[in-house]
Amino acid sequence: MRIEIISVIPDFFASPLEKGLLGIARRKGLAEIHVHNLHDYGLGKYQQVDDAPFGGGAGMVIRPEPVFACIEKLQAERSYDEVIFMTPDGQAFDQKRANRLSRKGNLIILCGHYKAIDERIRRTLVTMELSVGDVVLSGGEIPALMVMDAVLRLIPGVLGDGESALTDSFQNELLDCAWYTRPAEFRGMKVPDVLLSGHHEKIELWRQENARERTLERRPEMLGKESEKE
């Protein structure tokens, strides 16, 4: 997978792209991630990328010219499956979308900044708008990292245990179950006996039931009409 990130603060990504899962994916050759400084496509002596909004109002708006120049340059070199814009008013980013994106080849992720980006960018260049929650951040850089982490961990070979990602929360429409490790008893708190039994079918059944109980307690809307009956 190849991912192009467009940002006004490219240095933000220096450490995350070298450490953790993103660094592993790159070192294994399973992902290419390139960061592009939007100011390199800015206007004039000071490489301006933003301006005041028409009609007045607080904040600044990213101009269309730098974004068009950057994305069109990338698209002239190769084709991209999606041009993703990280924005609070986008579609909710969830595990289903992460699964779908993990099957793509080339992605462009545009990180918003300032008050907004010019609407003509969204109407013409952007193919997917994603939000990581009902909260406003200072820019799209942190959400972009969240998307990349969620997507790349699903690519075969990135995680040491390939099955681990397939049993995470949301993969089967439920939250994940409770997990335990050694010691079997800690400060009077014991691991459920079934997990020590060695009976794989019973263990799997316990995990499914526990996952459903946790989902009903913490995120009942995920169970839909079934939770309403209960």
From Swiss-Prot:
GO terms for biological process: tRNA N1-guanine methylation. The keyword Ion transport does not apply. It catalyses: guanosine(37) in tRNA + S-adenosyl-L-methionine = N(1)-methylguanosine(37) in tRNA + S-adenosyl-L-homocysteine + H(+). Its EC number is 2.1.1.228. InterPro entries: Alpha/beta_knot_MTases, tRNA_m1G_MeTrfase_C_sf, tRNA_m1G_MeTrfase_TrmD, tRNA_m1G_MTases_N, tRNA_MeTrfase_TRMD/TRM10. Pfam families: tRNA_m1G_MT (PF01746). It is found in: Cytoplasm. S-adenosyl-L-methionine binds at residue 112. Signal peptide: none annotated. Homodimer. Specifically methylates guanosine-37 in various tRNAs. PANTHER family: TRNA (GUANINE-N(1)-)-METHYLTRANSFERASE. This is tRNA (guanine-N(1)-)-methyltransferase.
